[in-house]
Amino acid sequence: MADAEDFCPHLDSIGEVTKEDLILKSKGTCESCGVGGPNLWACLQDGCQSVGCGESYADHSTLHAQDFPSPAHPLKSVPIAVGDDGESESDEDDIKPRGLTGMKNIGNSCYMNAALQALSNCPPLTQFFLECGGLVRTDKKPALCKSYQKLVSELWHKKRPSYVVPSSLYHGIKLINPLFRGYSQQDTQEFLRCLMDQLHEELKEPILPENQEQEEEERDDQREGERGGTTEEDFLSCDSGGEMGDGEGGGGVGTLSEMELLIREEVGRGLSEKEKLKERKLSYCHRRTSSEQADEDADVDTAMIPEPDNDAYMHCSSRSCSPHPVESISKHSSTPPRSSPLRTAHSYVLKKAQVLSGGKKRSEVRYRSVISDIFDGSILSLVQCLTCDRVSTTIETFQDLSLPIPGKEDLAKLHSTIHQSTVIKAGTCGDSYAAQGWLAFVMDYIRRFVVSCIPSWFWGPMITLEDCLAAFFAADELKGDNMYSCERCKKLRNGVKYCKVLRLPEVLCIHLKRFRHEVMYSFKIGSHVSFPLEGLNLRPFLAKECVSRITTYDLLAVICHHGSASSGHYISYCQNVINGQWYEFDDQYVTEVHETVVQNAEAYVLFYRKSSEEAERERQKVVSLAAMKESGLLQFYISREWLNKFNTFAEPGPISNQSFLCAHGGIPPNKYHYIDDLVVILPQSVWEYLYNRFGGGPAVNHLYVCSICQVEIEALAKRRKTEIDTFIKLNKAFQAEEAPSVIYCISMQWFREWEAFVKAKDSDPPGPIDNSKVALTKSSGHVQLKQGADYGQISEETWNYLLNIYGGGPEIAIRQTVAQYQDPEHLHGEQKIEAETRAG
């Protein structure tokens, strides 16, 4: 972090001003107009004691600066660290920086406290909740994003307490997932996934499609589908060091000062919006394959089913996954543990963004949120048939990587494979890679030789995080019980499955699989895994098509578990963004530690952030431009959310103003009343620099309510009212019937979607009526109700009304057949005659 004098060379011209002097002047009045505070500005020029009012009054402070020019620029607070109120670092921060606030244990809640502290020390996420409060809005219960925003504000407030009690968030997470109810110890990784999935669900925004990008995506899909005979090498980066793969797995707006408050000298990270849109199409909703030939067998959703007993498990974010059968693939004999035995208890993983099965024609809507922007990456999984060489591809979105901890035999096999591949690929991947490969080979050989001289029972196998990554991405043979069902061969074949990273996330969450749960017992793998504090390089694991330029990561936080598989305690080590020091967060106790303590920790979950010196220089340049008085005739509005990305992302991507614009270029009517929370005003020079550097847009010089959206909203409200009123009227008439001749059945799954739409809980109308899950079609073609089906009963008029609007089917009618009533004596006589006739 740059020193203050390095940031501004004009500080030498400032006179000696004490804190008491400033407090006294803040209680005074403007020397020109006599107005009182709080918006007063004191001139810090040596020998000048002037105090003037700010721009909310007559702005005499600016007039004074113009009359008595000095080499110092009157910046309106450009802090260089995370803050809740835009103030620069104070003397108090030098003693105890913000963010060093503990959390009280609310009964075995250390798993939650450790996870929240780790997330709190992820600057991209924390800055969003501190600076972009206007986007933290939701109508969905339990509004966990509001609870989290409040918690982050308390943790990073300048008047922070020694510890806080996260009771609101604690109760909210219990409402979402029954797994966390009660006071038993839970898995911190399960909590992280549940929390981030819910935050995404509450904060998600639909992605506005663009025709040009859609055409490009379709062309890319077509190219992917033409890879029928592609080999593994076609998908590997030339920087790879070995066999890679495996695929499991309008109102008032902000002022210039607001813009300056958001431009900070922090280490920032990011990703391209165009790339993000492209990957979302391939990974959101159903994790559909990227080619028409891609197999459904390879489309695995590890977040929805019990985790297979294999080494290559990847948590696919539920935002982009849908339930499918899993191809259980066993990789090594010493299989690493599952993170939790309760994988099937995830009730929160089903998302509205998913395309519902059963012939539904509902248009596919893709979503994004701050969670997906920061934590989502994508992996290209490939399965190759060894008979016909057909390659099936799948692009999967991941929120975290669950890595195996390889055993001694696995390490030997892994290193042997890597060394062989290094020798083979050194001549084909360029001189720089060859030199790097041989140097790594020699150093690794020496290290392994030294370790081999010491008894393994004393030293144990040396395992690095890179070893775990290599084990995760190692090729997996599909044979025996795990043979591959090839669509081209139409039978089971031997195959190979491998995967590569297609897009790297801004913050990489890595989960080490330390816990293994069997039917009769559970145990914990206590092997030490060494991990780098800086410079984690993922380039060897990238696909050639990878869109991420920055591939190195620095450690932000690490969560550790002390104890056994059945009991224990969670703590976290986090690096403070203000002073760069490492701290141990143990519930309500926060202690500074040396980085060697962190390196020797038994890591369970690690958070890495993209590192980029170029991004820091870009922010320095923008700060300098913002401080200059030269400005054009135009002022530009820019998304506060994108500006936060620029401040905290390594790759912020093109400028995107879609957070406050509609598809027609105006302000959506529902956002206009808080538009000042969504935008920041930029001077022309700053906008031109950012636009020339990053592209994107669109440029916005005037804010207005979109009249087209207003008409659409009114028409939608009218449609909803008409449909729900008509349904209530028809249903009342149906309830009044004593013996209806026919009753129609309707799928409750579809009905719940329609109900959510007409009650304005869902913005999109449902697709056609889908009764396929409750209908049973016999060989004769007759359709009847499936036994135990989830259905509702409606009248014929109601069915016809909904059918005329939405279409669909099939029709399932239950007809009442009433036998003709006959007199008992007459019937008895007929039966007697019939019996006598038979006897005769």
From Swiss-Prot:
- Where mainly found? cytoplasm
Residue ranges constituting the USP domain according to the UniProt record: 101-611
What is the annotated role of this protein in its UniProt record?
Deubiquitinating enzyme involved in beta-2 adrenergic receptor (adrb2) recycling. Acts as a regulator of G-protein coupled receptor (GPCR) signaling by mediating the deubiquitination beta-2 adrenergic receptor (adrb2). Plays a central role in adrb2 recycling and resensitization after prolonged agonist stimulation by constitutively binding adrb2, mediating deubiquitination of adrb2 and inhibiting lysosomal trafficking of adrb2. Mediates deubiquitination of both 'Lys-48'- and 'Lys-63'-linked polyubiquitin chains.
Protein name, per record: Ubiquitin carboxyl-terminal hydrolase 20
Identify the residues that bind Zn(2+): C30, C33, C53, H60
Q: Which SUPFAM superfamilies match?
A: Cysteine proteinases, DUSP-like, RING/U-box
Residue ranges of the DUSP domain? 613-706, 715-818
Which UniProt key words apply to this protein?
Cytoplasm, Cytoskeleton, Endocytosis, Hydrolase, Metal-binding, Protease, Repeat, Thiol protease, Ubl conjugation pathway, Zinc, Zinc-finger
Regions of biased composition (Gly residues) lie at 242-254
- List the gene name: usp20
According to UniProt, the reaction catalysed is: Thiol-dependent hydrolysis of ester, thioester, amide, peptide and isopeptide bonds formed by the C-terminal Gly of ubiquitin (a 76-residue protein attached to proteins as an intracellular targeting signal)
Q: Where are the zinc fingers (UBP-type)?
A: 6-117
An example GO biological process term is: protein K63-linked deubiquitination
Query: What positions constitute the catalytic site?
Result: C110 (nucleophile), H569 (proton acceptor)
Question: One Gene Ontology cellular component annotation?
Answer: perinuclear region of cytoplasm
Q: Which family does it belong to?
A: Belongs to the peptidase C19 family. USP20/USP33 subfamily.
Sorted alphabetically, which CDD domains does this protein's record hold?
Peptidase_C19R
Into which EC class is this enzyme placed? hydrolase
